[in-house]
Amino acid sequence: MTRIALGIQYDGAAFSGWQSQPHGNTVQDVLEAALREFAGVALPTTVAGRTDAGVHALGQVVHLDTELVRDPFSWVRGTNAFLPPTVAVRWAQAMPEDFHARFSAHRRTYYYALTYGPTRAPLLEGKAGYVTLPPGQSLDVTAMHEAAQVLVGEHDFSSFRAAECQAKSPVKTMYSTEVRGQGEWVFVRIRGSAFLHHMVRNIMGCLVAIGRGKRPAAWMGEVLAARDRKAAAPTFMPDGLYLAEVGYPDAFRLPASPASSSLFRGVFDEHAGP
């Protein structure tokens, strides 16, 4: 039996999330259907992180166990032949038995792409979040970036946890949080050990409230300390949320995540300011 890891990219707007559902309109369902067509047998997958409906992935990782002997590119080419245009296998690699897509991961990175202005941008529908503002007004990116820094470190993130979250503990570690502005765009990058259900979208709801001037930057710390979902802003839309990368120990030698997206290219250079 061989364990195979696959790197997956998908447009979440086309699906009802990652996890398999009876109606079959999920990323897991179409991926496993494609694997079954390619391999001729059912190949259940285990994913690094389940994404919600409308959430995209640039660097999702899954593993599967199989008795089939195929070279890595055969897994890529063969599976992609049966996938819709909204999903693609980017790489495949044979892994040791102790590799686990979820439990071996020590870091996950999410991006959020947000645009603002007097009207929505139809060509970005499903690909970016949006905030409608009167002409001449903008989001306060500096305040948003300042507010996000309170989230760094190990904290109880109950205030940002969905009611239906199944995680055993609300305590997670955030390694970095960054907010950058480019014209009528705001980009957010959050890196952490793991995330609760709706956690990033609930954080975004608070950041948007701060960016619009409805709350001061210090409010984020109050929300975090409250450990109460009712203290935070409403859950923000999924459209602009991307699972950008899943990090593993170097010993596994997994391929680097592909160039994430033209939306984010160059945004988070080390010396860029808010």
UniProtKB/Swiss-Prot annotation:
InterPro entries: PsdUridine_synth_cat_dom_sf (IPR020103), PsdUridine_synth_TruA (IPR001406), PsdUridine_synth_TruA_a/b_dom (IPR020097), PsdUridine_synth_TruA_C (IPR020095), TruA/RsuA/RluB/E/F_N (IPR020094). It comes from Ralstonia nicotianae (strain ATCC BAA-1114 / GMI1000) (Ralstonia solanacearum). Coiled coil: none annotated. The active site is at residue 52. GO terms for molecular function: RNA binding; tRNA pseudouridine(38-40) synthase activity. Homodimer. NCBIfam families: hisT_truA. Formation of pseudouridine at positions 38, 39 and 40 in the anticodon stem and loop of transfer RNAs. Substrate binds at residue 110. Belongs to the tRNA pseudouridine synthase TruA family. PANTHER family: PSEUDOURIDYLATE SYNTHASE (PTHR11142), TRNA PSEUDOURIDINE SYNTHASE-LIKE 1 (PTHR11142:SF0). The lineage of its organism: Bacteria, Pseudomonadati, Pseudomonadota, Betaproteobacteria, Burkholderiales. It is an enzyme of class 5 (isomerase). Its EC number is 5.4.99.12. Keywords: Isomerase, tRNA processing. This is tRNA pseudouridine synthase A.
